[in-house]
Amino acid sequence: KALSQTEPNLIIEFTEFDWGGDYYRKNGIMMPEDGVEMLKSYDSIYFGSAGDPDIPDHITLWGLRLKICQGLDQYANLRPVKLLPGISSPLKNVKEKDIDWSFIRENSEGEYSGIGGRSHKGYSHDTSMDVTLFTRHGVERIQKYAFEIARSRPRKLLTLVTKSNAQRHGMVMWDEIFAEVSQDYRDVTTDKMLVDAMTTRMVLDPKSIDTVVASNLHADILTDLAASLSGSMGIAPTGNLDPDKRHPSMFEPIHGSAFDIMGKGIANPIGSYWSSVMMLESLGEVNASKRLMLAIEKLTSEKKVLPRDLGGESSTQDITTAMIDIITGKNK
């Protein structure tokens, strides 16, 4: 809202939906049955977090966030990772330029396809099954998107992460399709890593990494590690994208609801701000996007107003006020 007040050509209209834990307590569902249809008329979606200490996690996730992502076919999850000015990595001798990554996560199928079941619950032969589903269509389109992202970055380096030594069907297909798609992107340098080895590489040789593409589960885990290596989970943004622009994309910080600090006013809002940067860029508001990113970098580089997870003592409201002051020019 502060940006729209200082950008003469930026007009943003907000509609807020009360979907989530409180809505579930009243209605027995996380969002209306026609909620996905309601969202289709909007240009973009700005998401807070899904979770409630009194509601099982699988209900809050599948009833809201995943329902939106899959319902709007937001098949590409883009997660930029960067060491912001003034922020220290827990890794030794890591410079700002050493962590500048772009993770692309398959966001529509794979380990989170939702296929499976459970029987004989409560008996000794209680049985459950979750099915990992990979389709050529799904794998090919996310890999092509990842190649496009890698091509747009200065280093033009793309790493494929799988576990094809142990997962000998679906992950082998990932490897095979990657080899095929790479033929159309000969200007992009490629390499492959097993997911367990990738965690070691991220810690021991972070500057060797640029753009990474992985399955739904693997990228979900790797990007939590990536966020922590860049300073804090509270910094990291993400975009759930429909690159084909048939439906609106959705932007959110990657962290969950953080029940242990809920209501204390100490949450780190930087991930939410950075998600707004991504949203504005996707809407074509390049100038506003750049201004907001510069404001974030000014905030972190000055180190005057920082949340507790970044070594400061400022409240969420203090940080928000400081950001507004930077954007509106009150903080010169």
Give the role of each language-model region:
Residues 20, 86, 193-200:
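Short acidic loop-to-helix transition motifs that present clustered carboxylates
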Residues 25-129, 217:
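N-terminal glycine-rich phosphate/adenylate-binding segment common to multiple enzyme folds
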Residues 1-7, 123-195, 208:
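Glycine-rich phosphate/diphosphate-binding loop of Rossmann-like nucleotide-binding domains
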Residues 314-332:
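Phosphate-binding loop/pocket of nucleotide- and phosphate-handling active sites
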Residues 9-33, 200-202:
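N-terminal beta-loop-helix "entrance" segment that forms/cooperates
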Residues 9-14, 153-162, 185-193, 285-291, ...:
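Flexible, glycine/charged-enriched surface loops at secondary-structure junctions
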